C-alpha cells in the first residue's frame, strides 16, 4: 500500500516512486544514504535496480509517494 507524505519525513530504506527521463511511468527507488536537508530542499541518494545511484532533490513540503518503509 502506497502512502503520500512530506519529503522531509523520508529515511534510509524508504522506497519511493520517482519519474525518470527515459521511463514512461514512475519506478521504485530506494533511499540508500543519509538524507541532506537544508532550509529549502531535501536531497536523497536513490537506487533503482539495474542503474547507477543518483541524487534527487525536492523542495520542502513536496509530497512523495512511499511504497514501503525500511
Which residues make up each language-model segment?
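Mixed-charge, Lys/Arg-rich low-complexity intrinsically disordered regions
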Residues: 1-12
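Short amphipathic beta-strand/extended segments with alternating polar/hydrophobic composition
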Residues: 6, 29-30, 55-60
Amino acid at each position: 500500500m502506497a502512502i503520500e507524505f512530506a519529503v522531509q519525513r523520508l529515511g534510509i530504506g524508504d522506497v519511493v516512486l520517482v519519474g525518470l527521463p527515459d521511463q514512461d511511468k514512475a519506478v521504485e527507488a530506494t533511499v540508500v544514504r543519509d538524507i541532506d536537508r537544508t532550509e529549502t530542499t531535501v536531497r536523497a541518494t536513490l537506487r533503482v535496480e539495474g542503474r547507477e545511484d543518483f541524487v534527487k532533490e525536492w523542495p520542502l513540503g513536496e509530497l512523495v509517494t512511499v511504497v514501503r518503509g525500511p
